[in-house]
């Protein structure tokens, strides 16, 4: 379950070996077979070049508890991560806003290590602040209220005590409502689907995170707007989402090697 971010997570870096690959927002589900296939190819080819793979949230479209491992699709994806770990690539995982209920059973099955949000990573002589990114969208007051409630452990315990079929229905309803809201926003604003996916981060929240960490380098996902930003507090890299099941397929990862960050495409 989700860990509340603490000041100690920013002051105590997680030290890893490079090359390090960063991905986020794959939103894996059985309903997105081409995206899932792209991830499987990535795990069995490019990801083997990395000593460390960092997944910065929303790895799954939704996750309502570790009973999801009984589902063949989710079990196969978990096996892919375990296969990668057994091949020698360390897997680090951060919760996203869709999969913050990934728990101890999933971590044990995949041999992954959970990162608090935010965290600091140290590799190749660099210190990097890592976040999923949703906590930086502070101008979305309704979402921030929802986030505060759903990260409370007692709320999570109550939800996990429900029958699995109830939890799945709730998640599917929330997913449908979210998609409808995005489509409406895109139509009203006249924006393309990718640009209207969700609200962007608040500059003041980004600045506060830079100051709290004291590190001028940040990597996050969530917004589906991949780009390198030069902020007053430092460089901010935004990771791409992955989608190979709709028009305008997209997907990339960020490589850290020899102290240099580069964005590289993922092939379908």
Swiss-Prot record:
<comment type="pathway">
    <text>Glycolipid biosynthesis; lipid IV(A) biosynthesis; lipid IV(A) from (3R)-3-hydroxytetradecanoyl-[acyl-carrier-protein] and UDP-N-acetyl-alpha-D-glucosamine: step 4/6.</text>
</comment>
<feature type="binding site">
    <location>
        <begin position="97"/>
        <end position="98"/>
    </location>
    <ligand>
        <name>substrate</name>
    </ligand>
</feature>
<keyword id="KW-0441">Lipid A biosynthesis</keyword>
<feature type="binding site">
    <location>
        <position position="132"/>
    </location>
    <ligand>
        <name>Mn(2+) 2</name>
    </ligand>
</feature>
<feature type="binding site">
    <location>
        <position position="97"/>
    </location>
    <ligand>
        <name>Mn(2+) 2</name>
    </ligand>
</feature>
<keyword id="KW-0443">Lipid metabolism</keyword>
<dbReference type="GO" id="GO:0009245">
    <property type="term" value="P:lipid A biosynthetic process"/>
</dbReference>
<dbReference type="Pfam" id="PF00149">
    <property type="entry name" value="Metallophos"/>
</dbReference>
<dbReference type="InterPro" id="IPR029052">
    <property type="entry name" value="Metallo-depent_PP-like"/>
</dbReference>
<feature type="binding site">
    <location>
        <position position="191"/>
    </location>
    <ligand>
        <name>substrate</name>
    </ligand>
</feature>
<dbReference type="InterPro" id="IPR004843">
    <property type="entry name" value="Calcineurin-like_PHP_ApaH"/>
</dbReference>
<keyword id="KW-0378">Hydrolase</keyword>
<keyword id="KW-0472">Membrane</keyword>
<feature type="binding site">
    <location>
        <position position="222"/>
    </location>
    <ligand>
        <name>substrate</name>
    </ligand>
</feature>
<keyword id="KW-0479">Metal-binding</keyword>
<feature type="binding site">
    <location>
        <position position="224"/>
    </location>
    <ligand>
        <name>Mn(2+) 1</name>
    </ligand>
</feature>
<feature type="binding site">
    <location>
        <position position="58"/>
    </location>
    <ligand>
        <name>Mn(2+) 2</name>
    </ligand>
</feature>
<feature type="binding site">
    <location>
        <position position="140"/>
    </location>
    <ligand>
        <name>substrate</name>
    </ligand>
</feature>
<feature type="binding site">
    <location>
        <position position="222"/>
    </location>
    <ligand>
        <name>Mn(2+) 2</name>
    </ligand>
</feature>
<dbReference type="InterPro" id="IPR043461">
    <property type="entry name" value="LpxH-like"/>
</dbReference>
<keyword id="KW-0444">Lipid biosynthesis</keyword>
<dbReference type="InterPro" id="IPR010138">
    <property type="entry name" value="UDP-diacylglucosamine_Hdrlase"/>
</dbReference>
<keyword id="KW-0997">Cell inner membrane</keyword>
<protein>
    <recommendedName>
        <fullName>UDP-2,3-diacylglucosamine hydrolase</fullName>
        <ecNumber>3.6.1.54</ecNumber>
    </recommendedName>
</protein>
<keyword id="KW-0464">Manganese</keyword>
<feature type="binding site">
    <location>
        <position position="178"/>
    </location>
    <ligand>
        <name>substrate</name>
    </ligand>
</feature>
<feature type="binding site">
    <location>
        <position position="25"/>
    </location>
    <ligand>
        <name>Mn(2+) 1</name>
    </ligand>
</feature>
<dbReference type="GO" id="GO:0030145">
    <property type="term" value="F:manganese ion binding"/>
</dbReference>
<dbReference type="GO" id="GO:0008758">
    <property type="term" value="F:UDP-2,3-diacylglucosamine hydrolase activity"/>
</dbReference>
<feature type="binding site">
    <location>
        <position position="27"/>
    </location>
    <ligand>
        <name>Mn(2+) 1</name>
    </ligand>
</feature>
<comment type="similarity">
    <text>Belongs to the LpxH family.</text>
</comment>
<comment type="function">
    <text>Hydrolyzes the pyrophosphate bond of UDP-2,3-diacylglucosamine to yield 2,3-diacylglucosamine 1-phosphate (lipid X) and UMP by catalyzing the attack of water at the alpha-P atom. Involved in the biosynthesis of lipid A, a phosphorylated glycolipid that anchors the lipopolysaccharide to the outer membrane of the cell.</text>
</comment>
<feature type="binding site">
    <location>
        <position position="58"/>
    </location>
    <ligand>
        <name>Mn(2+) 1</name>
    </ligand>
</feature>
<keyword id="KW-1003">Cell membrane</keyword>
<dbReference type="GO" id="GO:0005737">
    <property type="term" value="C:cytoplasm"/>
</dbReference>
<dbReference type="GO" id="GO:0019897">
    <property type="term" value="C:extrinsic component of plasma membrane"/>
</dbReference>
């Amino acid at each position: 379950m989700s860990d509340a971010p603490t000041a100690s997570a920013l002051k105590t870096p997680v030290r890893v070996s490079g090359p390090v690959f960063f991905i986020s927002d794959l939103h894996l589900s059985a309903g997105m077979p081409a995206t899932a296939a792209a991830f499987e190819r990535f795990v069995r080819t490019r990801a083997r070049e990395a000593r460390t793979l960092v997944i910065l949230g929303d790895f799954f479209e939704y996750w309502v508890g570790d009973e999801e491992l009984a589902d063949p699709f989710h079990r196969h994806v978990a096996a892919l991560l375990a296969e990668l770990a057994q091949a020698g690539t360390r897997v680090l995982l951060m919760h996203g806003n869709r999969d913050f209920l990934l728990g101890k059973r999933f971590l044990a099955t995949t041999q992954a290590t959970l990162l608090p949000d935010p965290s600091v990573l140290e590799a190749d002589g660099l210190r990097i602040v890592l976040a999923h990114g949703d906590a930086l969208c502070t101008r979305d007051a309704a979402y921030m209220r929802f986030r505060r409630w759903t990260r409370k452990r007692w709320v999570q315990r109550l939800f996990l005590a429900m029958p699995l079929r109830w939890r799945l229905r709730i998640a599917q309803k929330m997913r449908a409502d979210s998609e409808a809201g995005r489509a409406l926003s895109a139509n009203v604003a006249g924006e393309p689907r990718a640009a209207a996916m969700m609200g962007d981060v608040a500059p003041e929240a980004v600045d506060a995170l830079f100051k709290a960490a004291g590190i001028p380098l940040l990597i996050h996902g969530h917004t589906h707007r991949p780009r390198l930003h030069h902020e007053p507090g430092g460089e901010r890299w935004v990771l791409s989402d992955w989608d190979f099941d709709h028009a305008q397929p997209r997907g990339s990862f960020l490589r850290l090697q020899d102290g240099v960050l580069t964005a590289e495409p993922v092939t379908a």
